[in-house]
From Swiss-Prot:
The lineage of its organism: Eukaryota, Fungi, Dikarya, Ascomycota, Saccharomycotina. Interacts genetically with prohibitins and thus may be involved in the mitochondrial lipid metabolism. Gene3D superfamilies: P-loop containing nucleotide triphosphate hydrolases (3.40.50.300). Keywords: Mitochondrion, Transit peptide. It is found in: Mitochondrion. Belongs to the TRAFAC class YlqF/YawG GTPase family. GEP3 subfamily. The keyword Transit peptide applies. It holds the Pfam family MMR_HSR1. One of its GO terms (molecular function) is GTP binding. Residues 113-305 form the CP-type G domain. Disruption phenotype: Increases frequency of mitochondrial genome loss. It comes from Saccharomyces cerevisiae (strain ATCC 204508 / S288c). Residues 1-21 form a transit peptide. This is Genetic interactor of prohibitins 3, mitochondrial. GO terms for cellular component: mitochondrial inner membrane; mitochondrion.
Length: 556
């Protein structure tokens, strides 16, 4: 971090001489006031806010004036001006972040995506890396390419575990055993370096701190919980931002800055905190933090998506904020598991949350749905009816009577904007996971009888997968593991527990045979994963109690 006394010494004229020494407090990019088209641009105000201030302080007030950020009301006894300079320097943010965070006004094009290789340019070979994956959306976000790298010492960290489990007991003891065996069985990765945590609930944070090594990098997709984790560590271990020069020297905060940790800890943490936002790709540069006796690096998020379509283009702004703000997640669903019932109809009756997806159960099936996605749900006679209603909501000049159920923009108010997916056969319950959105639990009830495949229609560009219900899978597996003294695996070996879905043509009638055909194509180079290939599909689905999860296959 800047040595503030040195940074302010000799500055008498408003120019880049002040700005170049300051990074945006939100995204960590270097500030500049010369080119609005380049990152880090900061708008000059039209007039100075207070000409009576000494020149150094004028410059810093000048920086912040157009962002409506108020000066701290606290002042040190010896030099109040010095404290004001310090606060201002540490709180300057670029125009892009100011508009996005304070006015909720942002252009997605100003938040470009990065690839894994882009981000790895920040990470020296042989470094300690924490691969951050939100457990709530497992296996989405899990990147085998990161875990298999020989040039990095990688640990898997599963965040947001409070959105899957009722308490931290399973998170502490049961998840690591399950994940070790899952990685070995599924990806042939032999590793026991897995932590499941919840930064919001403070689950396993002390264990995590004791484990991670000095100079560790946090690596993952946008909005997976990296910055929230850092802020929890900063609060728990009195951490702060640092700046590391090209020689590796750590520039720690000045004594005046550190003094505030004791005199005004709230303000100190506000200044030091990592930028947490529901906006993806907010972080644009690596930021180092001193946490206890260790250095931790927050890296920008990287994308693995092949689609350039962004959720901001599809989903209503207010709905999207609810989806991304994890602190708004209602944990009562985890404990109570309140379900909604739905019967499959001959007309193609469907269930939706905001129009973000349409779930179509087969005719005659009785289904229970537990929703872990924010927003009210709605059922429609068929998909066409749902799309027609939401199209009216978007085009209506006034308030449509069903507008509270609409979470999509007009750009996807056509059936052609959705992809049709068939869910491979299952018995009992599954969880359907939508990347960066959440998941629902789907349960078929009554005596098993195959009535057809469930379908789900999803906007193009959104990744989806299914899994056996995660909490029950880990709990039952752990019990089996303990009862057999570790002889039985806590992760099932007799069947796949995760799967991708199968895209269908809109007019495909024989979805079961189409699924088998796609399954054979997807496993053509992975023959060891094939199961039941010689069985007739319609005979196979009559015996799911013995032949579980046919045609399940996950494409990493």
């Amino acid at each position: 971090m800047l040595n503030l006394c040195h940074a302010l010494r000799g500055v008498r004229q408003f120019s880049c001489s002040v700005i170049v020494k300051v990074k945006c407090a939100s995204c960590s990019i270097k500030l500049q006031d010369q080119d609005p088209s380049k990152p880090g641009y900061y708008t000059k105000p039209k007039s100075l806010p207070d000409s009576k201030l000494n020149p150094d302080l004028q410059d810093l007030k000048y920086l912040l004036f157009s962002q409506d950020i108020q000066l701290s009301k606290q002042a040190t006894q010896n030099d109040p001006d010095l404290k004001t300079k310090r606060d201002l320097l540490l709180r300057v943010i670029c125009k892009r972040c100011s508009n996005a965070l304070h006015h909720n006004n942002y252009n997605p094009e100003e938040f470009p995506e990065s690839t894994l290789n882009d981000i790895l340019n920040y990470v020296p070979r042989g470094s300690n890396v924490m691969h951050i994956v939100p457990f709530v959306e497992f296996p989405l976000h899990l990147d085998p390419n990161v875990l298999k790298r020989n040039d990095l010492d990688t640990t898997l960290v599963l965040t947001k575990s409070d959105q899957v489990f009722k308490d931290k007991n399973a998170v502490s003891k049961k998840v690591p055993i399950f994940m070790k065996q899952f990685l070995k069985n599924t990806l042939r990765i032999d590793s026991n370096k897995t932590f499941a945590i919840s930064a919001l609930k403070n689950w396993n944070i002390s264990m995590f701190y004791n484990y991670f090594k000095n100079y560790t990098y946090l690596l993952g997709n946008p909005n997976v919980g990296k910055s929230t984790l850092i802020n929890t560590l900063l609060q728990k271990y009195l951490g702060y931002k640092v700046k590391i020069d090209s020689t590796g020297k750590i520039n720690s905060p000045s004594e005046e800055v550190m003094q505030e940790a004791f005199t005004n800890p709230k303000n100190f943490f506000k200044i030091q905190a990592a930028g947490v936002s529901h906006i993806p790709n907010l972080t644009r540069s690596v930021q180092a933090y001193q946490v206890g006796g260790k250095i931790l690096f927050d890296l920008p998020g990287y994308s693995t998506s092949t689609s350039r379509l962004r959720l901001e283009e599809l989903i209503d702004e207010r709905w999207l904020q609810r989806l991304r703000k994890t602190d708004l997640f209602n944990r009562k669903h985890i404990k109570q598991k309140t379900y909604e019932s739905m019967k499959g109809t001959s007309q193609g009756g469907c269930y939706t949350v905001g129009g973000i997806f349409y779930l179509v159960p087969p005719k005659g099936s009785i289904n229970q749905i537990v929703k872990y996605i924010p927003g009210p749900s709605k059922t429609f006679k068929n998909i066409e009816k749902g799309i027609d209603v939401f199209n009216s909501c978007n085009s209506s000049s006034g308030t449509h009577p069903l507008s509270r159920y609409c979470g999509i923009k007009s750009v996807i108010c056509e059936k052609s904007q959705y992809k049709r997916y068939a869910i491979p056969p299952f018995i009992g319950s599954i969880e359907i996971v939508l990347k960066d959105i959440g998941y629902i639990l789907l349960r078929t009830t009554g005596r098993y009888e195959f009535k057809g495949l469930h379908e789900i229609w999803i906007p193009r560009g959104i990744q989806v997968g299914i899994r056996e219900p995660l909490e029950n899978l880990i709990e039952s597996g752990y019990q089996r593991y303990i009862e057999t003294n570790g002889k039985e695996s806590s992760c099932p070996r007799d069947r796949p527990i995760i799967s991708s879905l199968y895209e269908m043509a809109p007019d495909e009638a024989d979805t079961l045979n189409a699924v088998k055909k796609s399954y054979l194509e997807k496993t053509e180079k992975d023959l060891s994963a094939r199961r039941f290939v010689d069985d007739d599909p319609y005979d196979l689905v009559q015996h799911l109690e013995k032949k579980k999860n046919p045609y399940w296959y996950y494409q990493w």
